[in-house]
Regions:
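Active-site mouth loops of central-metabolism enzymes
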Residues: 1-10, 31-33, 57-70, 90-93, ...
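Metal-associated gating/positioning segment near the N- to mid-region
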Residues: 1-53, 70
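Short acidic/polar active-site loop segments enriched in Thr and Asp
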Residues: 24-26, 56, 81-84
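Structural detector of well-ordered beta-strand residues that form the stable sheet scaffold
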Residues: 27-28, 59, 116, 171
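Alpha-helix-loop-beta-strand connector modules within alpha/beta enzyme cores
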Residues: 40-60, 103-120
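Histidine/acidic residue-rich metal-binding segments in metalloenzymes
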Residues: 70-174
Length: 174
């Protein structure tokens, strides 16, 4: 499975067979959107990998990386084919900006979709990461230290306020 420039050793057959052995009959995977790709195209690309090999029922949450203009409107088409769960990121360089996040929340409500959010303040994470790297502090512990509680708390509060303003449901993943 492709992810973040790497390929995992797992595939849909191995993963869904393991699920079936454990008694799980339906799985949801994250299909991470490529840049300039509609939500439907993201679904179709990932579905092409799963369909030939899945041993149980499956569906996808679309991981939103690029959402503007026509791509924002593509949520309707994806909802029309049954994709009603989307994950946005407030962190990472591709993270959604607040104005676009608000628009996506409003669109999701209109079409009955649910937005999940990975909420962290990207600027603070980057600032703290750069600080620790410049000090030579690169052990795994400093990954944790570069993401203190307030970094997530601030972004959670912002996401909740945007959802309230859009009168839309929101799922905070962690």
């Amino acid at each position: 499975m492709p992810f973040g420039g790497t390929v995992s050793s797992d595939d849909y057959f191995a993963g869904t067979r393991a699920a079936a052995c454990g008694g799980t009959t339906t799985v949801f995977d994250f299909a991470l959107q490529d840049f300039n790709e509609t939500m439907t195209d993201t679904f179709n690309r990932r579905n092409a990998l799963a369909a030939p090999d899945a041993a149980v029922d499956y569906s996808f949450h679309i991981g939103v990386k690029d959402i503007h203009g026509d791509l924002l409107d593509s949520i309707k088409d994806a909802c029309d084919i049954g994709v009603t769960s989307y994950k946005v990121f407030m962190v990472y360089d591709f993270g959604v900006k607040d104005g676009v996040f608000y628009q996506l929340l409003a669109k999701s409500k209109e079409f009955g979709a649910l937005i999940a959010v990975h909420a962290e303040n990207n600027e603070l994470v980057n600032t703290l990461t750069e600080k620790y790297i410049s000090e030579g502090k690169t052990d795994a512990w400093y990954h944790y230290m570069s993401r203190p509680e307030f970094v997530e708390g601030e972004a959670d509060e912002r996401a909740i306020n945007l959802a309230k303003a859009a009168n839309a449901p929101l799922y905070i993943v962690h």
